[in-house]
Amino acid sequence: MSLFNKIVKEFQWGQHKVRLETGEIARQASGAVIVDIEDTVVLATVVGAKSAKPGQDFFPLTVDYIEKTYSAGKIPGGFFRREGRPSEHETLTSRLIDRPLRPLFPEGFYNEVQVVIHVLSVNPEIPADIPALIGASAALAVSGLPFNGPVGAARVAYVNNEYVLNPTREQIKASRLDLVVAGTERAVLMVESEADQLPEDVMLGAVVFGHEQMQTAIDAIHELVREGGKPEWDWQPAPKDEALNARVTELAQPELLAAYQIRDKQARSTKLKEVYAATSAKLEEEAVAAGTVAADKATVGNILFDLEAKIVRGQILNGEPRIDGRDTRTVRPIEIRTGVLPRTHGSALFTRGETQALVVATLGTKGDEQIIDALEGEYRERFMLHYNMPPFATGETGRVGSPKRREIGHGRLAKRALVACLPSADEFGYSIRVVSEITESNGSSSMASVCGGCLALMDAGVPMKAHVAGIAMGLILEGNKFAVLTDILGDEDHLGDMDFKVAGTADGVTALQMDIKIQGITKEIMQVALAQAKEGRMHILGKMKDAVAGANTQLSEFAPRMITIKINPEKIRDVIGKGGSVIRALTEETGTTIDISDDGVVTIASTNSEGMAEAKKRIENITAEIEVGHVYEGTVLKLLDFGAIVNLLPGKDGLLHISEIVNERVKDINDYLKEGQQVKVKVIQTDEKGRVRLSAKALLNEAAAQADTPPQQ
């Protein structure tokens, strides 16, 4: 009899065969599923605590996606030869998995849940993120935890005007769209995408296509649960204290209504804190007077939050002004300034209402490109975008240091939005780094980074294909009534049902990110949101074009200049030298940065034009071929009885025979030449062994012949 109760489900999904397994590996976890798609294999595990910690007032879900280097047949680098801190890709994939799972846990469920996905085997053509998301969903489904899933996921490409389900990496390279969508049987929960200026209807079509196709995976998970699922947890939410609810509402509602008439964020936040504190204090006072135990602050805080949401959502659905006084379609006031910082290569200050980004662009050489050692192989990134949001941006204190998951995710979204409009490496040979410093935040700071990033790039002289702008949309949905909000505030994001970010140009969408907190978002609602987002985007693009018509034609004086020359690939070793000695001396002596590609393209960069010209000249000399008939200014290296050895180019010498120095007979060569003397010579012969014969008297004869020729009338 086997130790294992192994359950396997296999199904065809588009062009791929998928295998789900449970019951053999990681049996002590609450749930564990292995997903295998064409040799990309992941193990997804879930462990849930049986009870919540005392005083817990939020849902502690953590998702960790971990890539093992052995999965690609590699040994990790570094001194310890083992996996270290999560890479940016692992962090982004962890967020991608977390986002559709989190909304499906019931309200009031505060038990700690940890989802861990290990990548065990990798087919370089099959990205591991979709198997990981399917695996996490399946592991939660079989675990018995209170989870309103399962979730399905799909990647969609757009090749030759057709949608492609779960494309290979080669297909993604040829695609104008890379979109990941996740959802349940009835609703879309999450979208993450990058596109090449595609129209809104194509983007929405991709979301709908992906949602339809993921049903195959959801059906397979249901079958796996029927045969191998654990008993469902007997979890019930804590009963609501209706009397406490009524008393909190009685005490706080008038004050909360007054707070939400305050348009300034800081003043409103201060008033809300006062309401929370006063309500808790009053309840404690009443409990002491009655000789009872006061309700804990977490419970009171949750009631107040629900009351806030009810007030704000009701006002918007009833057609009243939003928190800051706007209607649903108005974008906050925009201020733009470029060239903000004097010695950076490009900079812009983009302010939209109470959200502000100081964005800086820096140009570098090929040597500044980021080298990424991924499971599928090493590659280079010439465009980097980093997003930082310090605590002072929201008027708070907090930790300052390495970027958090949110900052990495926002930076990647802004990068996706801009990359489609960057010039190619052939058109603009620089590596580019953009840093967005969020100096104020009240909603949509990632989209401010897109706008500011585009402006900073143009200020740096990067020839962008078009202006790129981004906008964040929100949604309030109650029954059949809904309102789509343009350019949402932080509070509206917090209290609303959807965060929907769209970036693009006047011609189409370049990035789309959607996180939906509820079920019931229809295709029609998404159509309205996309149309309203386009309206807002076009407004912002107009403001950007008024401020900056196009890219600067001149680079900053502090940016490196570049020249490119082509050499014979066989000469690359001559330029590099033994152990890099020649190229090291070249860069140090000329103050330049030199990059050589395998095809013989040499890029020389420097802020000093004279040093760049000198480096170019020396490389051309090193790689030049000696040609018969050419005249060279050489240096006498050594005198012999029968002639002199003359250096023509670095590493290239020739023989000036004693009979080729002058026309008359030379008795003593020392009467005509000295070692170290500069001498002009002509190449008269080379042989198959590379030996070179030179002549000085040939030049004397040519000069005499020209002198004897009478001038033409």
Swiss-Prot record:
Purpose = Involved in mRNA degradation. Catalyzes the phosphorolysis of single-stranded polyribonucleotides processively in the 3'- to 5'-direction.
Residues annotated for Mg(2+) binding in this entry: 493, 499
In which compartments does the protein localize? Cytoplasm
Organism whose genome encodes this protein: Burkholderia pseudomallei (strain K96243)
Question: Cofactors per UniProt?
Answer: Mg(2+)
Question: Which domain of life, per UniProt?
Answer: Bacteria
Organism lineage reads as:
Bacteria, Pseudomonadati, Pseudomonadota, Betaproteobacteria, Burkholderiales
Q: Can the keyword Nucleotidyltransferase be found in this entry's annotation?
A: yes
State the top-level EC class.
transferase
* KH domain mapped to chain residues: 560-619
* Keywords, in A-Z order: Cytoplasm, Magnesium, Metal-binding, Nucleotidyltransferase, RNA-binding, Transferase
| Name of the protein this chain belongs to | Polyribonucleotide nucleotidyltransferase
Provide the E.C. number(s) assigned to this enzyme.
Answer: 2.7.7.8
